[in-house]
A protein has these predicted regions:
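Conserved ABC ATPase "signature" region
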Residues: 100, 115-133
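Helix-to-loop junction immediately C-terminal to a conserved catalytic motif
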Residues: 54
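Conserved ABC ATPase signature
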Residues: 137-141, 145
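Conserved ABC transporter NBD signature motif
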Residues: 62-76
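Catalytic Walker B motif of ABC-type/P-loop ATPase nucleotide-binding domains
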Residues: 162-165
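H-loop/switch region of ABC-family ATPase nucleotide-binding domains
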Residues: 197-198
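The feature captures the beta-strand-to-loop junction immediately N-terminal to the Walker
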Residues: 39-41
Length: 264
């Protein structure tokens, strides 16, 4: 790890719950302008990794640096989208208020939001096609709509690094396509994104790089080098039944798409 200004550096990170280790000795460096997927079986520590980076779960050992800094002062450059299950959807707050929370890093918690902040929040809602729902209570929305709102909140933070914990879970195909389109747009602007993902059928198409995790780091690198039968087997072990076929199908699909683009 030779770049102090990498968006995300992790060294020898170990995390335990009730003295039971769930992550062991994780070493990672994520480069600027990459769209990175985190995959692995249930219980692999994927969400724990994201929460530890955000300071929501304490590390037992090792360290995390965001743009070369440790601690809370670095979080102003991070946009975070949590799992839907971790949110209290009954809290009486409007869609617009949720997105405005993403502006607190700019205005501070005790200062009033400005017209500019409201304008930014509305622009972000418009990007995810949720502006007509700005005054609606967040708990009255569908799962896919709620996920769009939290994505808008992350966009409102105008961050350089985005951490997203399974943003595609429970959404329809239209919402999923909208989300991946926004992620690619952010990447094109030089932003860095780390996304926990569970669907191997499209992982190779969605991401530039993959982190294969099962309590330990199995692999990290470009999808062509990491999304292989051998590394998937190491990651998922005996639970790997149809995943090798998925890997082959994804490779064939990418090949056919390339051939089609070259022939047109």
């Amino acid at each position: 790890m030779n770049s102090l200004q990498a968006p995300l550096e992790i060294h020898d990170l170990t995390v335990s719950y009730n003295r039971r280790p769930v992550l062991y000795g994780i070493d990672l460096e994520i480069q600027e302008g990459t769209l990175v997927g985190v995959i692995g079986p249930n219980g692999a520590g994927k969400s724990t990794l994201i929460k530890t980076i955000m300071g929501l779960v304490p590390a037992t050992g090792g360290w995390v640096k965001i743009f070369g800094n440790k601690g809370k002062k670095s979080y102003t450059r991070v946009g975070y989208v949590p799992q839907r299950e971790s949110v209290d959807w009954d809290f009486p707050v409007s869609v617009l208020d949720v997105v405005l929370m993403g502006r607190f890093g700019h205005v501070g918690w005790l200062r009033r939001v400005s017209k500019k902040d409201r304008s930014v929040a509305c622009e972000c809602l418009e990007k995810v096609n949720m502006l007509p729902f700005a005054d609606r209570q967040i708990g009255k929305l569908s799962g896919g709509q709620q996920q769009r709102v939290f994505l808008a909140r992350a966009l409102a933070q105008e961050s350089d690094l985005y951490l997203m914990d399974e943003p595609f879970v429970g959404v329809d195909a239209v919402t999923e396509n909208a989300i991946i389109g926004l992620l690619r747009e952010l990447k094109s602007k030089g932003k860095t994104l780390v996304v926990v993902h569970h669907d191997l059928s499209n992982a190779k198409d969605y991401f530039d790089q993959l982190i294969l995790l099962n309590m330990r780091l199995i692999a990290h690198g470009d999808v062509e080098q990491t999304f292989t039968q051998n590394l998937l087997q190491k990651t998922y072990g005996g639970r790997l039944t149809v995943f090798t076929e998925i890997a082959d199908q994804a490779a064939a699909r990418r090949g056919s798409n390339k051939d089609l683009s070259e022939s047109t």
